[in-house]
Amino acid sequence: MDKAQHTQGKCPVAHGGNTTVASDVMEWWPNALNLDILHQHDNKTNPMDPNFDYREAFKSLDLSAVKQDLRALMTDSKDWWPADWGHYGGLMIRMAWHSAGTYRMADGRGGAGTGNQRFAPLNSWPDNANLDKARRLLWPIKKKYGNKLSWADLIILAGTIAYESMGLKTFGFAGGRADIWHPEKDIYWGSEKQWLAASDAENSRYSGQRDLENPLAAVMMGLIYVNPEGVDGQPDPLKTAQDIRVTFERMAMNDEETVALTAGGHTVGKCHGNGRAENLEAAPEGAELEDQGLGWLNKTSRGIGRDTVTSGIEGAWTTHPTQWDNGYFELLLNYDWELKKSPAGAWQWQPINIKEEHKPVDVEDPSIRLSPIMTDADMAMKMDPEYRKISDRFYQDPAYFSEVFARAWFKLTHRDLGPKSRYLGTDVPAEELIWQDPIPQVDYSLTEQEVTDIKAKILASGLSIAQLVATAWDSARTFRGSDFRGGANGARIRLAPQKDWQGNEPARLQKVLAVLATIQAGLTKSVSIADLIVLGGTAAVEKAAHAAGVHVKVPFAAGRGDSTLAQTDVESFDVLEPLHDAFRNWQKKDYVVQPEEMMLDRTQLMGLTAHEMTVLVGGMRVLGANYDNSKHGVFTDNVGVLSNDFFVNLTDMSYNWKPAGKNLYHIVDRSTDKVKWTATRVDLVFGSNSILRSYAEIYAQDDAKEKFVNDFVKTWTKVMNADRFDLM
């Protein structure tokens, strides 16, 4: 055979690039520590110019013009995907709802803040079927306004304007959500291996008596909330009510907000199940090339308009599905309902002996009237005693219902946008809401000399470097880049619940706070405790760096406020409690998840990279900032000196490392066989993992003394200022 010829089916091009998901490094070594979540939003994936600032771009957006275009879009039906009753409102609301509805309070992940609905897995979730059509309908508007309007903002604004166009007075809208450019890797959606797996399936998210795994809020893989047909697809409104309560609580919603959101979401629009689901093609991620990112196409029958199949449930909830009114409660509470199967075979509830005038008309032919429907979740609003009380009140007071819903919708769609200081646009509500974690603005500034004088007072107070560093760190470490909560601004570390958290060492904390309060009282200018806490850590780091022979000035920006207990939703702050902190070598108890994996999770939430994590751990160890003065990982004889000793000794082959108990290791001198130091898994992983070791070796080098200090100072400052949105 001629060597120039190729066997049929074999690619003639020599290419070594791995363009499929197969043969990933983690497939060969599945137990290796995967650092991908710390590298997921590398600038190489971002097509925008390096100096592009979306928040600045949004400020030049003509928001009124966008809203006008959106209102026009709502009734501009397209033949390729016609609007139900000539109005796209229901579709746009579902798109916005499902974008925001992935938020869960436990870790702040999910939500509407990144435009992640454009990417897998969300773009192909069963519960998001046909939302690709909604985004394509929005494309002309996105195209028109370009980089001034992100997909993330447009999706939420479209849902809000949809409500306004149908008669609801909304509470407001804030922009400022910057888009991401590839799928998120840090969000844990569940361990199931199949869509819509029942609760008794392998790798179930449930254990015990239907205990939902944390931090999950949705009841099934591929659902946003609960199963609309019932628990595991079996109708039982009271059981469904239990699922609803857990799910919405984990989204930071109370019972009243839950009923309002359920009813308000179902006051308009409809479900689609007038056909056979098996006729639908693959979801967008599995669709054919020529489908151009559209999924769930019906290529065997009409599949649009009245023949659309989405959830499988078929029908509208109300008599007037394009009008904001009280029709949801009028039908739900005044009729008896019975179980039926939709044309697609899904369970749904239909009213018994409904009056003809209460039936909604067909989406295409107004001369045809059809039965309304309710899902099992809707029936829970009627049959659960607590939900029923709220439903009755909303029914009797439509104005109150509208107000509660408008506020709940605003909360749902803005919960992960962070504090009010991050809100942009002309429609930002003036009212301050407690779930926004308000912080008073300060009216002072500090000169460089005043900062120097205060640092001197703090260092002369008798507080140690370790005490000052630990207190500043504990105050700042609660920051979550997922929903922009937490951080040092507000000094909530001095309030319940944070002042009593075990990880904050309450006795040590109160001692430090008392000293700082005394210093504060003696100052000639009013300075917040929040600023003094951070300034104390800043002064301590500078002193430790100077002791290492590196004279560096740690940046400090005054301007933090002190929040009050009245401005603090104590219960909602419980989820910010650290249960582990590798940077202080502490965990509250033993967990199934390995400590180094929890370290990555905390690092990602704080918005840090792998090398920033590395330099922070090494610095915190030699500063003596471990929890309860633990000596684990303190690989130095000069505690309080900001040296690179941690890395020098970690990489020194004069020692070997021996297990000495659960999450405990001895560092043994090879020549004497004597224990030199002790360590935990989160110490030794920096010598074990190949990537982390490469960073550790950089900092262990003989020429790394100044680089280590400078990198530590830069990363320390990043943590201290993570919630200073006024500086960004």
Swiss-Prot record:
EC class name: oxidoreductase
GO cellular component, one term: cytosol
UniProt EC number: 1.11.1.21
Residues at which heme b binds: 266
Reaction equations catalysed: H2O2 + AH2 = A + 2 H2O; 2 H2O2 = O2 + 2 H2O
Position(s), cross-link Tryptophyl-tyrosyl-methioninium (Tyr-Met) (with W-97): 225-251
UniProt site (Transition state stabilizer): 94
Cross-link (Tryptophyl-tyrosyl-methioninium (Trp-Tyr) (with M-251)): 97-225
UniProt entry tagged with the keyword Nuclease: no
Cofactor(s) the protein needs: heme b
Stored Gene3D superfamilies: 1.10.520.10, Peroxidase, domain 2
Protein purpose: Bifunctional enzyme with both catalase and broad-spectrum peroxidase activity.
Assembly, per entry: Homodimer or homotetramer.
Entry's family note: Belongs to the peroxidase family. Peroxidase/catalase subfamily.
NCBIfam families found in the cross-reference section: cat_per_HPI, PRK15061.1
Protein name: Catalase-peroxidase 1
